[in-house]
């Protein structure tokens, strides 16, 4: 939970949209429920309530996040490059660089889950964009 709170706190402090703050909070919600495809799981939950761009960022963040650690595990850290040229490539790389990969700091002062409740309620009370 702390990683997600840090990610969302960083997004909020950088004046991200309410939608992106909620996406930052929930981007890893699938870690325990769907460890083999956690990003796709999180994107599926958010998809009816967020833009195509936000859905894509959440869905692909796992691949983009590999840039920071995959080479230590014998994998290709540049796997994300297969999406170069995609209109959301830069936004996804930025999401990972500024908020996701830097949110493992045990000394970071995160907001609480309660602080994000109004954002979550706002986004999930929208009329769904899609089903």
Model-assigned labels for residue ranges:
Residues 1-5, 9-17, 48-56, 60-131:
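Divalent metal-dependent phosphate-bond-processing catalytic cores, especially two-metal-ion Mg2+/Mn2+ enzymes
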Residues 10-42, 58-62:
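His-Asp-centered metal-binding catalytic motifs of divalent-metal-dependent phosphohydrolases/nucleases
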